[in-house]
Regions:
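Ligand-binding "clamshell"
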Residues: 97-109, 124
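Short helix-initiation/N-cap motifs at beta->coil->alpha
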Residues: 66-77, 164
Length: 164
C-alpha cells in the first residue's frame, strides 16, 4: 500500500507540475503561499487515495483540494470548464472517448489503477444458477461496456462475433 501511495503521489505531483507549466490562469495560491491544486475524483477509491496523498504533497508545498463527484461525466465537464485543475478517476480510453464526444481538450498526465470488473447480484450466488435469458446490466459507455462484454464472454454467458 505504501508503494501504491508513493506512486499515486508521484503521478499527482507530476500532473501538478505539468499543469503548473501550462500557464493555467485558474491556479490559485493559498494564503500561506503554497500552490493550490484542485482535483476532482469519484469518492471510492479515488478521493480516498487522494486524502492519503494530501500530506505528501503538502511537504512539497502543494495544497491539495479534493472535489468529490458521484458520476463519471461531471469531473470531465468541470475540468473542461476549468473549475478544477485535474481529475483522477478514469482510464485513458474512457477519457479519450468522452473528450471526443464532448469536444473537450483532455490529456492524460499519468496512469491510474484500473478498477476490476465483476458480476454482482443480490439473488444469484453462482453463475451456474443464472437463468437462461436473464438480463444483465452493463456500463453505458463504449469503453467500459466493451470490457463488460468481454467479461461476459470469458464467463461463457455470451458469444461475441470476431472483430476481424
Amino acid at each position: 500500500m505504501r508503494k501504491f501511495l508513493a506512486l499515486a503521489a508521484t503521478v499527482i505531483l507530476g500532473g501538478a507540475l505539468l499543469i503548473a507549466g501550462c500557464g493555467n490562469d485558474n491556479k490559485q495560491a493559498a494564503s500561506d503561499g503554497k500552490q493550490v491544486l484542485k482535483i476532482g475524483a469519484t469518492a471510492v477509491p479515488h478521493a480516498e487515495i487522494l486524502e492519503q496523498v494530501k500530506p505528501i504533497l503538502a511537504k512539497d508545498g502543494i495544497e491539495l483540494k479534493i472535489t468529490e463527484f458521484t458520476d463519471y461525466n461531471t469531473p470531465n465537464l468541470a475540468l473542461g470548464d476549468k473549475e478544477i485543475d485535474a481529475n483522477f478517476f478514469q482510464h485513458v480510453p474512457y477519457m479519450e472517448e468522452f473528450a471526443k464526444a464532448h469536444k473537450l481538450d483532455l490529456v492524460s498526465a499519468g496512469g491510474v489503477h484500473l478498477e476490476p470488473m465483476g458480476l454482482y447480484s443480490r439473488k444469484i450466488k453462482d453463475l451456474k444458477d443464472l437463468p437462461k435469458g436473464a438480463k444483465i446490466a452493463i456500463p453505458n459507455d463504449p469503453t467500459n461496456g466493451g470490457r463488460a462484454l468481454l467479461l461476459l464472454q470469458k464467463q461463457g454467458l455470451i458469444t461475441l462475433k470476431d472483430s476481424t
